[in-house]
Amino acid sequence: MILVDSNIPMYLVGASHPHKLDAQRLLESALSGGERLVTDAEVLQEICHRYVAIKRREAIQPAFDAIIGVVDEVLPIERTDVEHARDALLRYQTLSARDALHIAVMAHHDITRLMSFDRGFDSYPGIKRLA
């Protein structure tokens, strides 16, 4: 099982960028390999937050369509996930709050692989980032 981060659909629907083709290649490889892809509710919130912040609300729906179209499930955020994220933030000083929440959801669901271009995950042990 692989958790798909928000930057994957955002590169897919965004303007020309070197990661646009990389994101497409990663998804195609995972899907053709029969991998189970999931995301979490925080990823959907990140998409909303980012596009509102850069005044591109019209990009929210295409990004949602891109990710919902490839994942098998959107995992919820539970209280225990937030508590796990808090603990990770106190232990790993370079970890962002959003990344800590994804890591907590991954731990909750025994997921060790993450599709993301965010190098912030690299400092956390036990996570294999696919980029």
Swiss-Prot record:
<dbReference type="GO" id="GO:0004540">
    <property type="term" value="F:RNA nuclease activity"/>
</dbReference>
<keyword id="KW-0378">Hydrolase</keyword>
<keyword id="KW-0964">Secreted</keyword>
<keyword id="KW-1277">Toxin-antitoxin system</keyword>
<dbReference type="InterPro" id="IPR002716">
    <property type="entry name" value="PIN_dom"/>
</dbReference>
<dbReference type="Pfam" id="PF01850">
    <property type="entry name" value="PIN"/>
</dbReference>
<dbReference type="InterPro" id="IPR052106">
    <property type="entry name" value="PINc/VapC_TA"/>
</dbReference>
<feature type="binding site">
    <location>
        <position position="99"/>
    </location>
    <ligand>
        <name>Mg(2+)</name>
    </ligand>
</feature>
<comment type="similarity">
    <text>Belongs to the PINc/VapC protein family.</text>
</comment>
<keyword id="KW-0460">Magnesium</keyword>
<protein>
    <recommendedName>
        <fullName>Ribonuclease VapC13</fullName>
        <ecNumber>3.1.-.-</ecNumber>
    </recommendedName>
</protein>
<feature type="domain" description="PINc">
    <location>
        <begin position="2"/>
        <end position="128"/>
    </location>
</feature>
<keyword id="KW-0540">Nuclease</keyword>
<dbReference type="InterPro" id="IPR022907">
    <property type="entry name" value="VapC_family"/>
</dbReference>
<dbReference type="GO" id="GO:0005576">
    <property type="term" value="C:extracellular region"/>
</dbReference>
<comment type="function">
    <text>Toxic component of a type II toxin-antitoxin (TA) system. An RNase. The cognate antitoxin is VapB13.</text>
</comment>
<dbReference type="GO" id="GO:0000287">
    <property type="term" value="F:magnesium ion binding"/>
</dbReference>
<keyword id="KW-0479">Metal-binding</keyword>
<feature type="binding site">
    <location>
        <position position="5"/>
    </location>
    <ligand>
        <name>Mg(2+)</name>
    </ligand>
</feature>
<dbReference type="InterPro" id="IPR029060">
    <property type="entry name" value="PIN-like_dom_sf"/>
</dbReference>
